[in-house]
Amino acid sequence: MAESVERLQQRVQELERELAQERSLQVPRSGDGGGGRVRIEKMSSEVVDSNPYSRLMALKRMGIVSDYEKIRTFAVAIVGVGGVGSVTAEMLTRCGIGKLLLFDYDKVELANMNRLFFQPHQAGLSKVQAAEHTLRNINPDVLFEVHNYNITTVENFQHFMDRISNGGLEEGKPVDLVLSCVDNFEARMTINTACNELGQTWMESGVSENAVSGHIQLIIPGESACFACAPPLVVAANIDEKTLKREGVCAASLPTTMGVVAGILVQNVLKFLLNFGTVSFYLGYNAMQDFFPTMSMKPNPQCDDRNCRKQQEEYKKKVAALPKQEVIQEEEEIIHEDNEWGIELVSEVSEEELKNFSGPVPDLPEGITVAYTIPKKQEDSVTELTVEDSGESLEDLMAKMKNM
C-alpha cells in the first residue's frame, strides 16, 4: 500500500512537470494580447499608466531621438540566447524593436539560473522556445522568429545566411543588424564569415572566463576590422577549443557583468539604429577597476578572410567615388568687445626704421614666408668729444663754481 502511494506521488510530480512545460509551450501569437493586452499599432507619447511606450517616446520630447517610433521598422538577429543574448533580447523587446530572430541550439538548465532572464520551470526547454514565450508576454507587438540549431554545421550555415539576408521585417529583405552573443570562437568565426560574405553589419560581444570583464565591438565589413583581422590566439593557432575544456571545470559567470555587457550592447544598437549619440566601434568593461576603454580598429589588408579583403576594396572604391569637399579657412578678424573707444595700438617704430634693422629676406617660393630675420650688425662708432682750452687757471674755475 505504501509503495502504491509513493508511485502515485511520483506520477503526480511527473504530470505537474509536464503541465508546466505545456504551459510554457503555449506561446501566444502576435496580436493575441500576450501580457494581458492587445497589439498596439502605433506608438503614442500619451503619458498614461496603460501606455507601455510613454517613457520611450519621451526621448523624442527631450531631443535625444528625432523619431523613436522608427525602431519598429528594424529587424535584429541575435545569435546565442544565453546570459548576454537573453538579456539583450529582453531589452530590445521592451524597447519595441520590430522583429527579433533568435538562434541557439542549447536547452535551459538549472545551471543557467545564476544568469538573468530564465526561470527554473523552463528547465528542459530549448532556449529559443523559452525566450520566445517570455518575450511575447512582455511585448506582443514584436515579431519573433526562432531557430533551434547550431549555426556552425555545414547543413545549418546556409540556412543561417538565408535568414539574415532574407528574414527582415519584410520577407526577402536583410536584417538591419546581427548581434553575436555566443560563448565560443567557432561560432564567432562562423558569424564573421557569413557577414563578410553578405556585407552585413554586426556587433560582437563577449564576457571573460573569470566573469569580471567584457566587451562589445561594431564590425562594418570593409570599413572596420573583422573578427578574423586580429583573431585571438586560440583561433590564430588553429587549436580545437574543445580540447581546452576539462571535466568538472567551467568558466565563471556573474549576472552583473553579463547585465552590464548586454546593456552597453543594446545601448550601442539603439544609437546605431536611431542615429543619436556616438556609436562605439569597440567598448570594453573591466569590473575590477570600473574601466571602460574605447578604440577603433582598421581592417587588416592581409586578412585571412578573402571576403573581408574584397569588402575592403569595395569600401575604398566607395570612398574614392565620393565628391571631395574643399575646405576654405577664412581668417577671422580680432574683435575687442570691450574696446568701447576704438583705441588702437600703434608701434613706436616706423616701417622704415624696422626695415633698416631687419636682416635680408631670402628669395622663397610663393606661399612661404620667414618667421623672423637676423638683425643687421650695428657698427660701433666712437665719437670723441673735444673741449677748447679757455686759458683759465684751475683756481679761477674753482672760484666760478663756488659762485654758481
Swiss-Prot record:
Widely expressed. Its main location: cytoplasm. The modification Phosphoserine is found at S45, S358, S393. This is Ubiquitin-like modifier-activating enzyme 5. GO terms for molecular function: ATP binding; protein homodimerization activity; UFM1 activating enzyme activity; zinc ion binding. It is linked to Developmental and epileptic encephalopathy 44: A form of epileptic encephalopathy, a heterogeneous group of severe early-onset epilepsies characterized by refractory seizures, neurodevelopmental impairment, and poor prognosis. Development is normal prior to seizure onset, after which cognitive and motor delays become apparent. DEE44 transmission pattern is consistent with autosomal recessive inheritance. Changing G342A: Decreased interaction with UFM1 without affecting interaction with GABARAPL2. The lineage of its organism: Eukaryota, Metazoa, Chordata, Craniata, Vertebrata. Keywords: ATP-binding, Cytoplasm, Disease variant, Endoplasmic reticulum, Epilepsy, Golgi apparatus, Intellectual disability, Membrane, Metal-binding, Neurodegeneration, Nucleotide-binding, Nucleus, Phosphoprotein, Ubl conjugation pathway, Zinc. Zn(2+) binds at C226, C229, C303, C308. InterPro entries: D-isomer_DH_CS1, ThiF/MoeB/HesA, ThiF_NAD_FAD-bd, Ubiquitin-activating_enz. The gene is UBA5. The keyword Lyase does not apply. SUPFAM superfamilies: Activating enzymes of the ubiquitin-like proteins.
